[in-house]
């Protein structure tokens, strides 16, 4: 799978015997659970960095899948990737975006700042799932799925993409609903006067609608500031590769 040889066996982990396969890469052999699509690099990271229980957000994994799909299409258009491999990567990325491969991303969020482990986790899952669908070893995690990319441009791009989608799909609609509710409450409570408080003591009178208007204005300004951040978030680092020079990326 993913260009590695493998065979079946059993190993004991935390008192439980598990079926496994053995994958080999440039760093040696790794025993990987037989029923998952990740490979040697993911397994190595999983075993060496068991820090905390927090996993990568599913939104980020889906964003990485979208970027891998876009890269496959771009590499095909540039003559770097053949049609069959392009279509295979696209098919698996669609499965990933639909959440059908969610059980294949076990790594902690506590990892290198470049997100190399998770980038390789996604590469391995796409390659191994694609090879399973093809019935032969067609996709390599680095040579095909990660073609023209680096963790240093893909991971920050995925962060931007995940943030934009989360803002547009959930946060901004929720803020719009909250603003509407506050505006309604502001109108409903006109004429009601209450005691304002400062320093945990009664201070001066204030209209309840005036108080609510402050909450509404704060929410509206926050929403406007979030919307103003979107154009910058839509600028992606893709194409910069490892150190920003674009090395190994076709132009």
Task: Go through each PLM region and give its residues.
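Short, Lys/Arg-enriched N-terminal segments with co-localized hydrophobic residues
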Residues: 2-17
């Amino acid at each position: 799978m993913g260009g590695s040889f493998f065979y079946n066996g059993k190993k004991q982990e935390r008192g439980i015997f598990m079926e496994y396969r053995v994958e080999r890469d440039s760093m040696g052999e790794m025993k990987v659970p037989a029923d998952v699509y990740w490979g040697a690099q993911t397994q190595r990271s999983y075993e060496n960095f068991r820090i905390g229980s927090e996993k990568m957000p599913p939104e980020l994994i889906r964003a990485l899948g979208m970027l891998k799909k876009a890269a496959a299409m771009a590499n095909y258009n540039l003559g770097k990737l053949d049609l069959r491999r392009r279509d295979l990567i696209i098919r698996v990325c669609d499965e990933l975006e639909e959440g059908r491969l969610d059980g294949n991303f076990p790594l902690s969020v506590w990892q290198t700042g470049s997100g190399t482990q998770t980038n390789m986790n996604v590469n391995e899952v796409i390659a191994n799932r694609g090879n399973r669908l093809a019935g032969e070893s067609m996709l390599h995690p680095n040579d095909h799925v990660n073609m023209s990319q680096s963790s240093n441009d893909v991971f920050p791009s995925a962060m931007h993409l995940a943030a934009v989608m989360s803002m547009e799909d959930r946060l901004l609609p929720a803020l719009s609903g909250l603003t509407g509710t506050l505006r309604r409450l502001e109108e409903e409570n006109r004429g009601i006067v209450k005691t304002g408080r400062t320093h945990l003591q009664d201070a001066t009178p204030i209209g309840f609608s005036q108080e609510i208007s402050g909450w509404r204005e704060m929410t509206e300004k926050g929403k406007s500031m979030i919307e103003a951040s979107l154009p910058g978030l839509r600028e992606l680092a893709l194409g910069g590769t490892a150190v920003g020079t674009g090395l190994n990326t076709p132009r």
